[in-house]
């Protein structure tokens, strides 16, 4: 759940910073837009700050900003910062004593590699572009 909220919040942060002056965005605004509990988001962003994904500024004009362009922050980086290494099962971490004789272990390793490939090849910038495209295709209602 942390990763899901974090990706949603980072995409919103990228949207608010897009074409802007790089000023920090209040986390309360991001939480409200993303429908994420503020206290939870504060904990998530503290971890993301330590991981170098976001930067923060204190004070009246404070808030958070992406530490790098959205196109340089992969979803995999966010997930591993919050949840650790991707491991659907223990044997992908080398912790299974049956790995050398288990037919399923290679399947789990392939699944892990595929997931890492998708998440590593997708950036916050990509997600923002996808959301903007979806919004552009939304039906318009006129009164």
Located regions from the model:
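Short amphipathic alpha-helical elements of helix-turn-helix/winged-helix folds
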Residues: 8-19, 81
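Short, hydrophobic-biased segments on the C-terminal half of alpha helices
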Residues: 45-46
């Amino acid at each position: 759940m942390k990763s899901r909220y974090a990706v949603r919040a980072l995409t919103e942060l990228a949207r608010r910073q897009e074409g802007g002056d790089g000023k920090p965005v209040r986390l309360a605004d991001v939480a409200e837009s993303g429908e994420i509990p503020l206290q939870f988001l504060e904990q998530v962003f503290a971890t993301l700050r330590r991981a170098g994904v976001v930067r923060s500024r204190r004070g009246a004009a404070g808030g958070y900003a992406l530490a790098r362009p959205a196109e340089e922050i992969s979803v995999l980086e966010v997930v591993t910062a919050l949840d650790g290494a991707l491991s659907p099962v223990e044997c992908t971490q080398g912790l299974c004593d049956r790995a050398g004789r288990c037919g399923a272990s290679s399947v789990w390793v392939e699944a892990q590699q595929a997931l890492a490939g998708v998440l590593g090849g997708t950036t916050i910038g990509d997600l923002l572009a996808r959301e903007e495209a979806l919004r552009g295709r939304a039906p318009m209602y006129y009164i």
